[in-house]
């Protein structure tokens, strides 16, 4: 219940932050897809903790083990099971707060819903759960690239009040990965890093916005009316930990425009491809991809677990003062970049297979 996603290209994630490991089972991946296992590991490396001075110091190698579904590097069409073992979990870091409700964390709501919670490391509410998503998303990215030459890139657009000027059509992977904050605008990245470090030293945290572009998306994917492409993207991305907002194309900014300003005029073309003069729609019209770049943004709140003293209650409702210990990201955004890419890829791969099934021509 709640740990599976997709209709044809489906995933089920499992594991807790301080359990034996975390992983995913992919069902519905087409057979004979040749996978680059190094790409899966590289995406996990971009997500893993301890990779820079502005991420949690938890030291995990996050080496993926593929248990089933492949013959050599080719998919069999059977379930693909992948797992990453937890090696650096420290339950003792949570011994003093295991009966405490951290403000804005999932502790309280998990307890109220289930009557029990994984008090060590946040359990399923931990960002460590996303390891399975990133691994599965890497498979989905390879499927999309081989099927339609689709490229999915995400980057940090804003941290706190520092926003970068970025043109989605021009961003490259190397520009994104050249600094530890994963912002392709270097001058803005330098300021972002300083801001995250400053808040971390204060025992505080900050949030921001990740932007994502899909180039060469499959045309015509999306299922009206309840499975519109942007609706499924919103659900997928808002299922990531710490997300609080989603927009596609012009987003909320488009509400300030007139129709004559916002409409994307179609251009004459000799090919069967749709071309528009502008892209305020963000590559999606009527819930269906039109072939233009899909551009979207996701808002992430500040990390809930901080070292500053906060007023809260324990499981019995008693007022207490909490000063959290343990290892936590002062800002989740640099590590969330591959998570966003993964969830976008999973949605697109699922809709690609659904489109092939309904409209094979």
From Swiss-Prot:
Molecular function via GO: chorismate synthase activity; FMN binding
Alphabetically ordered keywords of this record: Amino-acid biosynthesis, Aromatic amino acid biosynthesis, FAD, Flavoprotein, FMN, Lyase, NADP
Classification via InterPro entries: Chorismate_synth, Chorismate_synth_AroC_sf, Chorismate_synthase_CS
Positions of FMN binding: 124-126, 286, 301-305, 327
Annotated Gene3D superfamilies: Chorismate synthase AroC
Enzyme class: lyase
PROSITE patterns given in the database record: CHORISMATE_SYNTHASE_1, CHORISMATE_SYNTHASE_2, CHORISMATE_SYNTHASE_3
BP term (GO), one: chorismate biosynthetic process
Catalytically driven reaction(s): 5-O-(1-carboxyvinyl)-3-phosphoshikimate = chorismate + phosphate
Xref: Pfam families: Chorismate_synt
Cofactor note: Reduced FMN (FMNH(2)).
Residues holding NADP(+): 47
GO CC, one annotated term: cytosol
Pathway listed: Metabolic intermediate biosynthesis; chorismate biosynthesis; chorismate from D-erythrose 4-phosphate and phosphoenolpyruvate: step 7/7
Required co-factors: FMNH2
Endpoints of the signal sequence: none
E.C. code: 4.2.3.5
PANTHER family associated with the record: CHORISMATE SYNTHASE
HAMAP family: Chorismate_synth
Role this protein plays: This reaction introduces a second double bond into the aromatic ring system.
Family under the similarity heading: Belongs to the chorismate synthase family.
Subunit field text: Homotetramer.
Protein name per its UniProtKB record: Chorismate synthase
Organism of origin: Prochlorococcus marinus (strain NATL2A)
Phylogenetic lineage: Bacteria, Bacillati, Cyanobacteriota, Cyanophyceae, Synechococcales
